[in-house]
């Protein structure tokens, strides 16, 4: 019951705390092209995460599950939206259902709604090989997300305090998994050092989960008697984390998430090097406040606007969008210079 109550608290406080931190995309400017030689009607948005082919560079990221009927209904609605737009979708952490079988229905519902969809299972980095297998089987997942959430756990009143052996557990799951593994942050971003460590143990897909979206330190602080307010502004902004990711020069697939709300955010994330982008809190807020049809309409507009932007840039495909010229400026530029990451190649390609 404690875990289920926490799931419901997360939804409540995620909606009430909002997405107030900046994601850094205001520091990214496209170089305008007056002769784009493009046609809106022939723009295509297909992309890939590793070997998984996706019809859109937008997917519905992990949100919830394991909190009884309310979370079942949310996942049911999100699965309907995913089916309508042919989007991939991730579920929230399934540890609740591994601990309490009665919660499994809140995850399994997505396959009932969308039998042929692309779905990602989800567990924390404390998971064992056996738990990873059960989570994948539970929803017949196409991939497994393993989330890294150190700051959330430290801020969570009942959270973990021991983070030893995480990399070794991830390596074991990678070596034994029948589906691809995606390692993701939950809103605090990933450094190039973290990504290199993950590459070294065989990880091939990463969701950088940058600062700018749902702030899980703020969410957990709402549940504390004594706030750990110093964690509320902790992390690496989304735009910065994407560039840190690409600087590793590894054959990784990158997912950009963390405060992405507009088609311009999507376009900038992809142009910086992401293969796809993920929405969570923004979609949840629309669903809970305005309803499912409004969310369906919003995603339609996102795709329309993304194609407008690609047309303006002369990018006929997602791959071409990844090579358009842009300029990195402001706080993002200064951070990257301090980190020894040159951004000049973005403006000269």
Swiss-Prot record:
The keyword Oxidoreductase does not apply. Gene3D superfamilies: Aldolase class I. It catalyses: isopentenyl diphosphate = dimethylallyl diphosphate. One of its GO terms (molecular function) is oxidoreductase activity. It is an enzyme of class 5 (isomerase). One of its GO terms (cellular component) is cytoplasm. Transmembrane segments: none annotated. Its EC number is 5.3.3.2. Keywords: Cytoplasm, Flavoprotein, FMN, Isomerase, Isoprene biosynthesis, Magnesium, Metal-binding, NADP. Its cofactor is FMN; NADPH; Mg(2+). FMN binds at residues 62-64, 93, 122, 184, 214, 258-259, 280-281. Mg(2+) binds at residue 153. Substrate binds at residues 6-7, 152. It comes from the Bacteria. One of its GO terms (biological process) is isoprenoid biosynthetic process. InterPro entries: Aldolase_TIM (IPR013785), FMN-dep_DH (IPR000262), IPdP_isomerase (IPR011179). NCBIfam families: IPP_isom_2. Involved in the biosynthesis of isoprenoids. Catalyzes the 1,3-allylic rearrangement of the homoallylic substrate isopentenyl (IPP) to its allylic isomer, dimethylallyl diphosphate (DMAPP). Homooctamer. Dimer of tetramers. This is Isopentenyl-diphosphate delta-isomerase. It comes from Bacillus cereus (strain ATCC 14579 / DSM 31 / CCUG 7414 / JCM 2152 / NBRC 15305 / NCIMB 9373 / NCTC 2599 / NRRL B-3711). The lineage of its organism: Bacteria, Bacillati, Bacillota, Bacilli, Bacillales. The gene is fni.
